[in-house]
Amino acid sequence: MTATWEKKEGNEGLLKVTVPAEKVDKALDQAFKKVVKQINVPGFRKGKVPRPIFEQRFGVEALYQDAVDILLPEAYGEAIDETGINPVAQPEINVTQIEKGKDFEFEATVTVEPEVQLGDYKGLEIEKQDSELTDEDLQEAIDHSLGHLADMVVKEDGAVENGDTVNIDFDGYVDGEQFEGGQADGYDLEIGSGSFIPGFEDQLVGVKTGEEKDVVVTFPEEYHAEELAGKKATFKTKVNEIKYKEVPELDDEIANELDSDANSVDEYKENLRKRLSEQKAEEAENVEKEEAINKATDNATIDIPQAMIDTELDRMVQEFGQRIQQQGLDLQTYFQISGQDESQLREQMKDDAEQRIKTNLTLSAIADKENIEANDEDIDKELEKMSKQFNISVEDIKNTLGNTDIIKNDVRIQKVIDLLRDNAKYVESTKEDK
């Protein structure tokens, strides 16, 4: 077999392939064995028609399409390997010759992976992230954990304060008329949660149990119900009950309840500090890595073919469908609720799809340029890491994956990201202190 590759405009080219006549004859034999089983010829049992009789009656041409179907997949795959091209979409095939006793010839118009013109990827200016855990961070985490153990206690006297949970009845009016979805009885609302229209919760601060108040708010311009967007509304509201959180004091018993490995408050704080420090350091590292990736990608120039974008959008729509399925919805139901269709969803995802592709191509191109590869030791380490993380044996992971190509590529790309970060120039954060 011979194959030639001729680059055309953009990311397309013409692949010309010639398969020897001997293989054509073998494919015709296979095609005959398949087709003859379906043929009825008077004087012969089904499937027992001799080849010469078949060709005399139907012509050898009747076998050509089946022979092409047999020859094409293998020949196309071998041609890709021989020419070293990397297709990103299904080719357009044009058979130029298929005939008994002659070579099989075809042309394939192929869209290939685009060339990447790398820009600067070393010495990138990256903002240094604060990875130090402060005493304030630790106390905030402790307070948050204690909050989960808090009891809700009815406030017998006093007014609504921020952080309280109020039970309310409300009746909403726009232009003096009630509107759909604007009424409720016995609704529990945490003040300060931001779950209601801006301004609603603030106006309940200071109100006492049993009191009524007209809460006046304006719906946001981008409110999901278009008929209410930007309009002023009055909610006649009654406070039925006020509850506040009674947070327990941190002692040795509570410390052990929050962390079974801690037998005292000091041990709990020490364990928590260590865990939070590791978490904050990891978060800081991830932010720095993301900035390095984005800058290296922005500095690269790539003409992404539409076929790659379409394929990535197919993948993203599928991923989105799987996520909403976990929430009990399917895509069609989502489209009905949102008023969107798939074409609109794909248009919303288009920029992200292009960025994903550009990022992957850029990192892969850097790996090629820097001769970065994942060796067996790297792969074994990653498998051990996955085994501990998911509590699955290495053998089970290998059996599930089938091969380690995905892990090999992931490790390779991670090495590229480490290279970007290790060679970056770090500058102090310009953000104001929190």
Swiss-Prot record:
Keywords on record: Cell cycle, Cell division, Chaperone, Cytoplasm, Isomerase, Rotamase
Signal peptide start-end: none
Catalytic activity: [protein]-peptidylproline (omega=180) = [protein]-peptidylproline (omega=0)
Entry EC number(s): 5.2.1.8
GO terms assigned for molecular function: peptidyl-prolyl cis-trans isomerase activity; protein folding chaperone; ribosome binding
Domain PPIase FKBP-type positions: 163-248
Subcellular compartments: Cytoplasm
Annotated Pfam families: FKBP_C (PF00254), Trigger_C (PF05698), Trigger_N (PF05697)
Gene3D superfamilies noted in UniProt: 3.10.50.40, Trigger factor ribosome-binding domain, Trigger factor, C-terminal domain
Family annotation (InterPro entries): PPIase_dom_sf (IPR046357), PPIase_FKBP_dom (IPR001179), Trig_fac (IPR005215), Trigger_fac_C (IPR008880), Trigger_fac_C_sf (IPR037041), Trigger_fac_ribosome-bd_bac (IPR008881), Trigger_fac_ribosome-bd_sf (IPR036611), Trigger_fact/SurA_dom_sf (IPR027304)
Annotated GO biological process: 'de novo' cotranslational protein folding; cell division; chaperone-mediated protein folding; protein transport; protein unfolding
The UniProt record lists the keyword Cytoplasm: yes
EC main group: isomerase
A single Gene Ontology CC term: cytoplasm
Domain of life the protein comes from: Bacteria
Domain characteristics, as noted in the entry: Consists of 3 domains; the N-terminus binds the ribosome, the middle domain has PPIase activity, while the C-terminus has intrinsic chaperone activity on its own.
Record family assignment: Belongs to the FKBP-type PPIase family. Tig subfamily.
Function of the protein: Involved in protein export. Acts as a chaperone by maintaining the newly synthesized protein in an open conformation. Functions as a peptidyl-prolyl cis-trans isomerase.
NCBIfam families: tig
Protein name: Trigger factor
